[in-house]
Amino acid sequence: GKLPYTDIQLSLHSIMHIDAAGLLDTAQFIASPNCDERPTGTEISLLVIHNISLPPNEFSGQGVIDLFTNRIDPQAHPYYQSLQGLKVSAHFFVRRDGTIIQFVSCNDRAWHAGVSNWQGKDRCNDYSIGIELEGSDITPFTDTQYEVLITLTQCLCNQYPIQHIAGHSDVAPGRKTDPGPCFDWERYDSGLRRDFIKRSTNSTP
């Protein structure tokens, strides 16, 4: 017979697993040097959703990987000259085809949010996991990206005491615009289990 709803959810969860080292079993791991230890005793309580493409609005290349591993060639594209010396990373990068690349263990602090504040608490990198979707503010994301993001989110929420999900623009308003107007928050929220975290607004003054 048909699986009950809860069993279907459980089977989805089994697709992805994060081990004690903070690594996702379905991701390709490419270590970024742009990370460090979280402050002692910090609980992971926030997911931050971003978009990124390098060069801007171009997909499938190695630009994002090069950026997160400090191998960007400033001569490769005019835009890259503005990235010289930038040291950034995210925990996860979800490509257009749904492939996941992990750059930093979830146990460690990735450098994705920059100057940021969530509900009165500064330094979001300390207590968050950063997920970059390959995309831009002017390009709709793919069906596969939503499916993978939803499954990854549920996996992370099972593993860590995550209480909130926010966009980069929510934690750095006025400075950042991603994941942008093309990201369908309603689709993302509705894909999560009904008892899952709902995105709340940033109450920071």
Question: What residue spans do the PLM features occupy?
Answer:
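N-terminal catalytic cores of peptidoglycan-degrading enzymes
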Residues: 7-122
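N-terminal amphipathic/basic-hydrophobic helices that include classical n-h-c signal peptides
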Residues: 1-14, 203-205
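Intrinsically disordered, low-complexity N-terminal regions enriched in serine/proline/glycine
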Residues: 4, 78-79, 159, 187
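Basic/polar, cationic surfaces and motifs that engage anionic cell-wall
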Residues: 15-24, 122-128, 136-205
